[in-house]
Amino acid sequence: MTHVLDVQNLRVSFPADHRRVYPVDGVSFWLDRGETLALVGESGCGKSLTSLALLQLVPNPGQIEPGSVIRLADTDVLALRGEALRRIRGRRIGMIFQDPMTSLNPVFRVGDQITEGILAHFKISRAEARDRALQLLQEVGIPDPVERLNAYPHQLSGGMRQRVMIAIALAAEPEILVADEPTTALDVTVQAQILEVLDRLRTSRGMAVLLITHDLGIVAGRADRVAVMYAGQIIEEAPTELLFANPSHPYTQGLFASVPRITGPLRRLTPIRGNVPAPSAWPSGCRFRPRCPKAFDKSEQEPPLLPVDTDHRMRCWLAERHG
C-alpha cells in the first residue's frame, strides 16, 4: 500500500566550524490517510526542522542531504522546484506553525489572511474565497465568525489565534496537516479545545496529521502512533497504547518517569540527568549513552532501530535482550 507520506533517511545539515553538522540525521517515518503520528521529543531534538524539510523550508544555510527521500504518495517532493513546489505547500501539506502571534501578519485582517491562502490555490472570486474563509472559521469553532473576519490578530486571544492558524492551514484542503506544537503557551482548557478541533477535522476530512510536541500528556488518546526523537534521530516508535504500556528505550522511560501523575501512589519525579548535547557535540555510538543509566560496553557502537515487539522498534542494543 502506498502511504500518503513516506520519509526515508532524511538528513538535514548546517555548516559549523569548517564542517557540517546534522541536527536531523537519518529520520524515517510514514503516514497513512486518516491517522495521527505524534513526533515527540525535547526542544532541539530536530522535530520542527523535520517538519520544515517536508516542504523544503529548511532555513539557509541548511540543506537537505542527497539520499534523503520525501514522497507524497507518488510525488517526489525533493525533485520539485518553483511553481510545482509552491502547489504542494498548503494544497497537499498544510502547516500550523508554533507561534500564531508571530506567524500571523499583524497588519492584515484575519479574513484577508485566510482569503489569500484560498485564492493562491483555487480559481474563484474574492467574494467566494471570503465565504469559504467564513466557513473555515465556523469549522474551527470560532464564535461570531463574521466579526472575527474583520479583526486583527492582536484583537484575538491566544486560543482564537491558534484556531485562525488552523483555518489558514486548512484553506487549501490539504491531505496532510502538520501541527507543530499547536498548544504551546495555551492554558489547559484551551489546549484541550484545540486538540479536539484537530481530532474532529481529521475525522471529518480524512486527513493525515503529523502532531509535533514535547508534551507526552497530549499524545495519549490523540495519536495512533508515536515516534520519539532524541539528538536528531528517532529512537523509539510504536503504536500509542503499546508505547505507553511498555516504553522500552531508556530515554523514553526517562520521559515517562519525569511526568507528574494524578493517579496511583505518590512518588518522586526522576529527571533525566545531564543535558541534550548540541549537534556539533553528539557522542559516538548511542547518542543517549552519556546520560543513560543502562549504558554498557556495546553502547559505544551506534545502534540501528531494532525490533522490540510487533510494530515496536527502538534504537538501543537492549532490544536484543528483549528477544
What are these regions (language model features)?
Residues 1-4, 13-26, 57-64, 81-84, ...:
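A short, flexible loop at the N-terminus of ABC-type nucleotide-binding domains that lies
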Residues 58, 63, 76-94, 120, ...:
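ABC ATPase NBD coupling module
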